[in-house]
């Protein structure tokens, strides 16, 4: 094992980390998605129309902040309330504006296998770097049905694909064994696990290939997920504090556990409060208060309830103060 230390200039901060970590990172063909990937909101005007100028500013914000990649039109991007044409228009705009300055992961999951194939093929045609595919929701497929669903998508469209298991939204929980079988398919490169169950990551580390990306989708348990062997996350919190969260994630991945936990302690209440109501309601309000987007959100989702607005606003003030006082 290489024991020498290297100094990495990361987002304007000097970090001393193990050289072996960075060597292993760049040997992983999927290294572009290691660290903090943002589950980007879709900014909207009050009438629900997409605000593409605000979207441009958000893309620049994440490029400047060192975010690993952007997920376009996932759950946080309100994929459930955009039509197919608009869905693809948002992906197209994001890919073109990003212009290879940051990788773009397109949300292309559906509970119809044929629709998921169509969306994934279109996303590839538009130039997305990878696709995020949620487990089919509402129709509750069997475990073998899940395997056949993702297998056919992978065989039909030659683009890197990331599985997405979020049983709290889909009413189906993909087993570790099915994930491990799917991990053997070359263009299925990873999974976003949003179960919040740390026993899952412990099993995935053992059963999946070493270069299979293990990404958390649960901000509240992210640091422990990374310490257990995860490679990064697709984050809601990263919408608001991308630079800070990237520091947390890379510290944890590199094995600097004390630093990661110390940094994350400043964000713990915020992670939880961003789910006071259904995502993306609170995070959109937070970004609105930061001046980064209008208040627009689409029915059946509504603007954040008045009783929670002050909580989010206080979180923003506290995070800003705590990070300014940090010695990092």
Regions found by a protein language model. Give the residues of each.
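Catalytic alpha/beta core domains of metabolic enzymes, predominantly
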Residues: 171-268
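C-terminal alpha-helical cap/extension of soluble enzyme domains
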Residues: 35-41, 65-67, 76, 227, ...
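Low-complexity, intrinsically disordered or signal/transmembrane-proximal segments
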Residues: 13-15, 26
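N-terminal amphipathic alpha-helix/helix-capping segment at the start of soluble metabolic enzymes
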Residues: 26-53
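Active-site beta->alpha loop and helix N-cap motifs at the rims of alpha/beta catalytic domains
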Residues: 30-34, 52-163, 167-170
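Cationic, low-complexity basic patches in intrinsically disordered or flexible, solvent-exposed regions
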Residues: 4, 8, 14
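Conserved, mostly hydrophobic/aromatic
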Residues: 48, 62, 94, 123, ...
């Amino acid at each position: 094992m290489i024991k020498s230390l290297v100094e990495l200039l990361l987002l304007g901060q000097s970090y001393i980390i193990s050289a072996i970590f960075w060597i292993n990172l760049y040997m992983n063909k999927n290294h572009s998605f290691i660290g903090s990937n943002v589950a980007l909101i879709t900014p909207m005007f009050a009438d629900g129309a997409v605000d593409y100028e605000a979207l441009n500013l958000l893309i620049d914000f994440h490029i400047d902040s060192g975010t690993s990649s952007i997920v376009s039109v996932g759950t946080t991007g309100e994929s459930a309330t955009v039509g197919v044409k608009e869905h693809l228009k948002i992906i197209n705009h994001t890919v073109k504006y990003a212009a290879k300055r940051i990788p773009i992961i397109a949300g292309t999951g559906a509970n119809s296998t044929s629709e998921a194939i169509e969306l994934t093929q279109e996303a590839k045609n538009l130039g997305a770097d990878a696709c995020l595919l949620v487990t089919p929701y509402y129709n509750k497929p069997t475990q073998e049905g899940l395997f056949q669903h993702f297998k056919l998508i992978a065989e039909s469209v030659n683009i890197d694909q990331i599985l997405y298991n979020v049983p709290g939204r889909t009413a189906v929980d993909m087993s570790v064994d099915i994930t491990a079988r799917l991990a053997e398919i070359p263009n299925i490169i990873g999974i976003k696990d949003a179960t919040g169950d740390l026993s899952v990551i412990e099993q995935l580390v053992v059963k999946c290939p070493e270069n299979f990306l293990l990404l958390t989708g649960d901000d509240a348990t992210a640091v422990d997920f990374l310490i257990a062997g995860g490679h990064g996350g697709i984050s809601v919190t990263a919408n608001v504090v991308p630079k800070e969260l990237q520091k947390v994630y890379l510290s944890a991945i590199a094995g600097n556990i004390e630093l990661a936990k110390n940094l994350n302690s400043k964000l713990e209440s915020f992670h939880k409060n961003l789910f006071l109501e259904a995502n993306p309601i609170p995070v959109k309000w937070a970004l609105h208060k930061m001046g980064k987007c209008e208040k627009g959100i689409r029915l059946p989702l509504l603007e954040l309830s008045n009783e929670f607005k002050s909580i989010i606003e206080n979180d923003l003030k506290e995070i800003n103060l705590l990070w300014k006082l940090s010695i990092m």
